[in-house]
Each structure stands twice: as C-alpha cells, then as structure tokens.
C-alpha cells in the first residue's frame, strides 16, 4: 500500500494536513499533530511517505499514538518509510518506537533541509523483534542539511544480516536523537548513551542495546 502524509505549518495558523493510505494525521493541539494508523502498517510491500513543511516563526510537534509494528507481507518482506522535512521554523519530531517483527525488513530514511534559523529535535526509536523474536532487519538513513551545507549523514543497521550481526552479541534496540542547535539532553535518555558534538552547533545522541528502556 502507498501512504502519503503532508503537514504544513505556518506562523499564526493551524497546521494543514493531507493524508491518504494507512496513516492519518490528527490535530491534537494548536501546534501538535499525532499520526494515527487506520490500517495495519507497515506491512511488507508498503511505502510510507511523510512530508513536513514549517515556515519561518512556526512551531510543529509531531507524535504518534502507538508504536508501529513492521510485519512481513504476503509477497514481500520489505517495507519503507521516508520523512522529508523542510524547516524554517521549529520542528520537534518524536514518533513512538518502530517494532520490527520476525522476518520483516523495514527501511527508514529521514531527510531534513533547514535554514540557519531553524530549530530541530528529531528522535527515532527502534526495536528488533516482538517478545521472543530477534530475526527482523532495520536500516535507517538520516541526512540533515542547514542552508545547503551538510550537517549530518548517519546510517545505522540492526538485526539479522546487518553490519552489527554477530553470534557473540548484537544490539537489537536503538535510540537516535539529533538536535540543532545543540542543547542539553534534559529529557530521559539511557545512562550509557553517547552524545557527539557535531560541526555547525548540533548534537547527536545514540544508544544501542537489547531492549528499549521504558520511558
């Protein structure tokens, strides 16, 4: 199934939404949109695209009402989700975790184009396997530019067949959070997370383990 979501935020106006397919957007506050699954997603064969545009002086918070469970489809194991974000204002993107079920293969790509005055907080959480499972695969690519200058190119793989797959031990869970400009990570984060200072006054927090922390 093809799913498309478009969210446009402008200063002094409620966000505008256009949605088709298995995801719908719901305005839950003047500056907050929650994504709601209206059908099982993502399934193998699904392609999900979310496009976000934020004008200068506007603020948008994007959440989801529940975790996304990536499942293998009848004809394909692969599903994909892409985020295209154009930000001149402020974006706080923190959807619920993605759970990749056994045998499913899910691919995430986030592309951000921001202006020098933009403010960004982007968090992604992933868990390979439901209870008792460990054979799913996930890959994530995050590309962020500020004023056409590269800020970050970040690629991660988890699960069976990934670059981190090893019989002696492999991570099955991930938290990744990008902030621009860099600020203190005052919200909950695992004690053993790593925070990297990036060029251009940005920061990237990453954590890997066996199970996502509760919180």
Give the location of each predicted region.
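A short, polar/proline- and glycine-enriched secondary-structure boundary/capping micro-motif
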Residues: 24-27, 71-76, 103-105, 131-135, ...
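Transmembrane beta-barrel architecture of outer membranes
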Residues: 45-49, 78-80, 105-109, 137-141
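Glycine/small-residue-rich interface belts in oligomeric ring/scaffold proteins
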Residues: 2-83
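A structural signal for small-residue-enriched, beta-sheet-centric alpha/beta enzyme cores
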Residues: 36, 124-215
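Internal, conserved structured core segments that host functional sites
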Residues: 75-132
């Amino acid at each position: 199934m093809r799913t498309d979501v478009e969210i446009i935020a402008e200063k002094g106006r409620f966000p505008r939404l256009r949605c088709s397919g298995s995801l719908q957007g719901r305005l839950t506050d003047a500056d907050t949109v929650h994504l709601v699954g209206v059908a099982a997603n993502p399934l193998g064969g699904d392609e999900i695209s979310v496009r976000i545009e934020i004008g200068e002086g506007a603020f948008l918070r994007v959440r989801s009402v529940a975790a996304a469970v990536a499942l293998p489809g009848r004809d394909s194991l692969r599903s994909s989700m892409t985020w295209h974000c154009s930000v001149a204002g402020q974006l706080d993107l923190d959807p619920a975790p993605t759970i990749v079920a056994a045998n499913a293969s899910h691919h995430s790509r986030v592309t951000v184009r921001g202006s020098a005055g933009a403010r960004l907080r982007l968090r992604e959480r992933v868990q390979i396997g439901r209870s008792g499972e460990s054979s799913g695969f996930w890959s994530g690519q995050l590309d962020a530019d500020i004023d056409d200058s590269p800020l970050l190119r970040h690629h991660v793989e988890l699960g069976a067949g990934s670059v981190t797959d090893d019989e002696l031990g492999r991570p099955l869970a991930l938290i990744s959070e990008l902030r621009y400009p860099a600020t203190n990570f005052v919200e909950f984060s695992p004690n053993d997370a790593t925070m990297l200072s990036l060029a251009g006054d940005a920061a990237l927090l990453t954590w890997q383990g066996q199970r996502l922390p509760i919180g």
